[in-house]
């Protein structure tokens, strides 16, 4: 009897061991938290394209400064002229004078044109800097064919540009007469701002400037309210005489 009981106990122990081996106790495993999905990365917006001035050709020259009489010398009569642009409002508040119509091309102070540079206006139309020269001393805008100015057209403005090519550094006087007002830049520096309404006379303003050796960019913006529309500009010494060694390119 004792032998039977011992055999039964032994069988129970063996069976328990087999059950434990078949079903091992699971270990405690820490749950790994799910990672939040990464936020979608939005591509950086492409920088707005800055309109580039379309260049159709090189500048022309050199040309001599013009002379009318012995005491009327040094006139710049070869220009690149672009227009017309609007100059709305009533004097003395015509707003075109203070509007930078070259803002999409670097701005008036930084702008550099060449023969054929295109400017897209706010209304979508395109105007160009094109060469013009006169056999006189005055730039009369109504005579500039490519501007297509209608008879007695009012409240407009134009830009004119040229290069003064100097054979050395020189102190000069740039003398301006205008109908009506103007802004003048030389080598991208604002030299004068005359928001006036007047008839033109020679040498209404005298600006003492220093030309560098080589080409010096001159840009002038001339506005019109009513009546005649013109300007004259000459480059002379303090005695009003032409200075040798200066030519003009446009």
Where are the regions a protein language model picked out?
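Bacterial N-terminal signal peptides
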Residues: 3-13
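Bacterial lipoprotein signal-peptidase II cleavage site
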Residues: 17-27
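Beta-strand-rich ligand-recognition modules
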Residues: 186-233
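A general sequence property marking short-to-moderate contiguous segments
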Residues: 131-152
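Extracellular and analogous surface-interaction loops
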Residues: 160-172, 208-213
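Accessory carbohydrate-binding/adhesion or oligomerization-edge regions at the termini
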Residues: 27-138, 220-250
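Extracellular beta-rich ligand/substrate-recognition surface
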Residues: 147-158, 195-200
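Aromatic-lined ligand-binding clefts that engage carbohydrates, nucleic acids, or primary amines
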Residues: 166, 171-185, 218
């Amino acid at each position: 009897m004792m032998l039977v009981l011992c055999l039964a106990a032994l069988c129970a122990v063996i069976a328990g061991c087999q059950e434990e081996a078949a079903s091992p106790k699971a270990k405690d495993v820490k749950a790994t938290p799910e990672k939040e999905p990464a936020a979608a990365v939005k591509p950086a917006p492409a920088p707005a394209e800055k309109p580039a001035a379309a260049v159709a050709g090189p500048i022309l020259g050199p040309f001599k400064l013009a002379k009318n009489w012995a005491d009327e010398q040094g006139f710049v009569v070869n220009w690149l002229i672009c227009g017309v642009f609007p100059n709305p409002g009533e004097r003395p508040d015509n707003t075109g004078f203070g509007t930078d119509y070259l803002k999409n091309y670097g701005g008036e102070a930084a702008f550099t044109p060449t023969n054929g540079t295109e400017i897209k206006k706010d209304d979508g139309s395109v105007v160009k800097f094109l060469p013009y020269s006169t056999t006189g001393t005055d730039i009369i805008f109504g005579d500039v064919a490519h501007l297509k100015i209608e008879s007695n057209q009012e409240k407009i403005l134009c830009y004119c540009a040229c290069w003064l090519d100097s054979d050395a550094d020189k102190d000069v006087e740039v003398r301006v007469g205008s109908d009506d007002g103007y802004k003048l830049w030389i080598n991208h520096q604002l030299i004068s701002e005359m928001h006036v309404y007047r008839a033109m006379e020679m040498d209404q303003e005298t600006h003492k400037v220093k030309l560098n050796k080589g080409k010096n960019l001159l840009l002038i913006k001339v506005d019109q309210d009513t009546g005649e529309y013109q300007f004259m500009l000459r480059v002379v010494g303090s005695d009003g005489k032409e200075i040798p060694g200066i030519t003009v390119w446009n």
